[in-house]
C-alpha cells in the first residue's frame, strides 16, 4: 500500500525566450552608421531621414549623428531620424 500520493502531471512549465525588443539608442545619443536604434515587431517606429529598416523592421543608422524621435503626420506616427553632427 502506497504511503505517498502519486505525483500528478501538468501541462504547464514552458515559456518562450525573451526577444530583447525595444529602443536601443535614445534621443540625443550619438550613433555611428550601422548602429541599431530600435528592435521591434511591426513598425511601431517608422524610419525617418538617414535611417534604414531591416526585414524584421529593425531600424538602424545609415550615417553618423544624433538620434531624434518625433511624432508627425495626421496619424501621429512616431519617426526616428539621425541628425548629422
Swiss-Prot record:
Residues 1-20 are annotated as: Disordered. GO terms for biological process: translation. The keyword Nucleotidyltransferase does not apply. GO terms for molecular function: structural constituent of ribosome. GO terms for cellular component: cytosolic large ribosomal subunit. Keywords: Ribonucleoprotein, Ribosomal protein. InterPro entries: Ribosomal_bL27 (IPR001684), Ribosomal_bL27_CS (IPR018261). Transmembrane segments: none annotated. Belongs to the bacterial ribosomal protein bL27 family. NCBIfam families: L27 (TIGR00062). PANTHER family: LARGE RIBOSOMAL SUBUNIT PROTEIN BL27M, RIBOSOMAL PROTEIN L27. This is Large ribosomal subunit protein bL27. The lineage of its organism: Bacteria, Pseudomonadati, Pseudomonadota, Gammaproteobacteria, Alteromonadales. The gene is rpmA.
Amino acid at each position: 500500500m502506497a504511503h505517498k500520493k502519486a505525483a500528478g502531471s501538468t501541462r504547464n512549465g514552458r515559456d518562450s525566450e525573451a526577444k530583447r525588443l525595444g529602443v536601443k539608442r535614445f534621443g540625443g545619443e550619438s550613433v555611428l552608421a550601422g548602429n541599431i536604434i530600435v528592435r521591434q515587431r511591426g513598425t511601431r517606429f517608422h524610419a525617418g531621414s538617414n535611417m534604414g529598416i531591416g526585414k524584421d523592421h529593425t531600424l538602424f543608422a545609415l550615417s553618423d549623428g544624433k538620434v531624434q524621435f518625433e511624432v508627425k503626420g495626421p496619424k501621429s506616427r512616431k519617426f526616428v531620424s539621425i541628425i548629422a553632427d
